[in-house]
Amino acid sequence: MDFPQHSQHVLEQLNQQRQLGLLCDCTFVVDGVHFKAHKAVLAACSEYFKMLFVDQKDVVHLDISNAAGLGQVLEFMYTAKLSLSPENVDDVLAVATFLQMQDIITACHALKSLAEPATSPGGNAEALATEGGDKRAKEEKVATSTLSRLEQAGRSTPIGPSRDLKEERGGQAQSAASGAEQTEKADAPREPPPVELKPDPTSGMAAAEAEAALSESSEQEMEVEPARKGEEEQKEQEEQEEEGAGPAEVKEEGSQLENGEAPEENENEESAGTDSGQELGSEARGLRSGTYGDRTESKAYGSVIHKCEDCGKEFTHTGNFKRHIRIHTGEKPFSCRECSKAFSDPAACKAHEKTHSPLKPYGCEECGKSYRLISLLNLHKKRHSGEARYRCEDCGKLFTTSGNLKRHQLVHSGEKPYQCDYCGRSFSDPTSKMRHLETHDTDKEHKCPHCDKKFNQVGNLKAHLKIHIADGPLKCRECGKQFTTSGNLKRHLRIHSGEKPYVCIHCQRQFADPGALQRHVRIHTGEKPCQCVMCGKAFTQASSLIAHVRQHTGEKPYVCERCGKRFVQSSQLANHIRHHDNIRPHKCSVCSKAFVNVGDLSKHIIIHTGEKPYLCDKCGRGFNRVDNLRSHVKTVHQGKAGIKILEPEEGSEVSVVTVDDMVTLATEALAATAVTQLTVVPVGAAVTADETEVLKAEISKAVKQVQEEDPNTHILYACDSCGDKFLDANSLAQHVRIHTAQALVMFQTDADFYQQYGPGGTWPAGQVLQAGELVFRPRDGAEGQPALAETSPTAPECPPPAE
């Protein structure tokens, strides 16, 4: 059973998805206008896209600079309808020839032939016979015949994505034949009448005949000499790219680029286009044979295929073919004006010249910001002149294009739409993602001549080379450090200025970098967005997840070239190399011992300060090294405990409160109360968990008094016997029971009687304190043996101590 309308229904659904932006995996950006599409549809309709997507490039620059023509071609792909007019036929033809869509090319040529001016008012054969009139008449006849055939063939309902070429012109539709008979005055061009063309897929012969006739009559060649063309195209493309109004960019949805004012960020895609996108299979159409001179002769797009006799590759663009030939001949006609290095391609030569002096000579008089191109400066000046009409609602910043505004809004939302397919790490801009992909790609062909660092993309190498430029535009004036982007330099300058513009909404702590703020906020929210797909363990940072995943896979991609040792992270390799070179820039101010990295120095300083910042969250014991804490957790708690790292806020005062201090404070606090007697019992007697709770309550009281005197005091709880410090009273109270001679503070309040245990105390002879028993005495202080209680009184509730 056949369903003739099924293919038409599928095409309609795809068009609706395109209009709504659903399931689109490709985006064109032309003149700031975004066109979404499906790669499968593009490849089905265009030989160019079919070959292009085989290479799977994320971003490709196309020689398409008019949004109107591209919009018409996309509309044709999804609806099989094309609105042609004398005003837009050139734009549509330019796009169609570049994308190798022969049906549209044929129709555009036919329409242009009908629109050519007549040489005489009568328009008869005799007048046409003069000055090439016979040739023009023949072309007109073929074009009219072609349009008529296509119209007749299209009267049957097309099945599948057949081409409907439709020209709408406000008035009543007329046939192509009647339009061909109309004539006008000699001084006015004769325009074609409005027609509706519906070519059937079976009308290929008519299209082929028309193509052959029209290609022979082509009077205008669409190419220039490759040397001049390459340089001019490269310059024009750069200017238009960075102004946001340049050649179309074809992008996969996962790595979409907004056009706009970030030339430093987008320079790595300037040379992304390759010849491979314009190569065709041998079955595409017949080859035109001839000598080398014939094959290099400039022809219109799609009118001839050039085949390399050495390797068999085919090209429709003469300029691409000439550049390819230089691979075999070894010819390098383009040389760098600074170092005379030779190149076979003008774009590569131009990119190389930028590495010598990527300065920005065009400066803004208003704010001093500089640009490499005058066109970018003019675009920037729109901000000051009030032409920047796109305003951010969050911070009020103005932008000249909507694309720049959208990219800026990601800063406020924290959204990172560009995700790495290998490790899941997300990025707010595609350039950062592309640079991150360097860590996964082992095939790095582009090598830095200064430091031997390698890259898999020439754009990333170009960005890296800025580091080696003496007195370059991205050099910190304070410390001389070089950066690849102005954004990185701006963040670095905050280190010297002390500026911290990013504030945590939970604790008001300030940060110089938005990424640091984002990681800090996760401490409050408990968010761990980076989850391991193998074991389910979650992490707050993507870098931690990457290192963790490599533990599963055993991957150690970073190799020391000197000893062959491999590492999970690049920072580990960098530290390892410093050991080889004996570079120890971090020196201890107390003993002058030097260390390779600042982390080792921080661990060493703890020896001098006696600090134990690594705390076991199970028992509260502190350690001066994290490896000692891990060993403790493993042996004492069988691995069922966590780790706390004590990091006091900057500028806060740290007050160490010992057990002896707490006893004194508690005694002084109770001096005015009705305390009858304090009895001291050796710890050798039974000490219960209930008594420990009593101790915690009294410690809390003492801490409360300290905090009332100075609310900003940060309190650590220290053990008198071993010096261990704890974050809270509970941890200290649990720890106290480890030492046999340690004191427990217990005292009497208005309602209950408590005791203080101490090493120097005595106990009435014959009196044994059993577990769960407390000593009660009369409030009037009457002498006698203490009475025993079956249960312990409940400890008074106190506010929790500050951590």
From Swiss-Prot:
Q: Where in the cell is it found?
A: Nucleus
Q: Does the keyword Plastid apply?
A: no
List GO terms (cellular component aspect).
nucleoplasm; protein-containing complex; protein-DNA complex
**Residue(s) of cross-link: Glycyl lysine isopeptide (Lys-Gly) (interchain with G-Cter in ubiquitin):** K397, K481
Residue numbers spanned by region Interaction with HCFC1: 637-803
Q: How does it assemble?
A: Homooligomerizes (via the BTB/POZ domain), multimerization is required for DNA binding. Interacts (via the C-terminal zinc fingers) with GIF1; the interaction results in the recruitment of MYB to the CDKN1A/p21 and CDKN1B promoters and repression of transcription. Interacts with TRAF2, interfering with the binding of UBC13 to TRAF2, and inhibiting TRAF2 E3 ligase activity. Interacts with MYC (via the C-terminal helix-loop-helix motif); the interaction inhibits ZBTB17 transactivation and growth arrest activities and renders it insoluble in the nucleus.
Q: What is this protein called?
A: Zinc finger and BTB domain-containing protein 17
Q: Which organism is it from?
A: Homo sapiens (Human)
Source species taxonomy: Eukaryota, Metazoa, Chordata, Craniata, Vertebrata
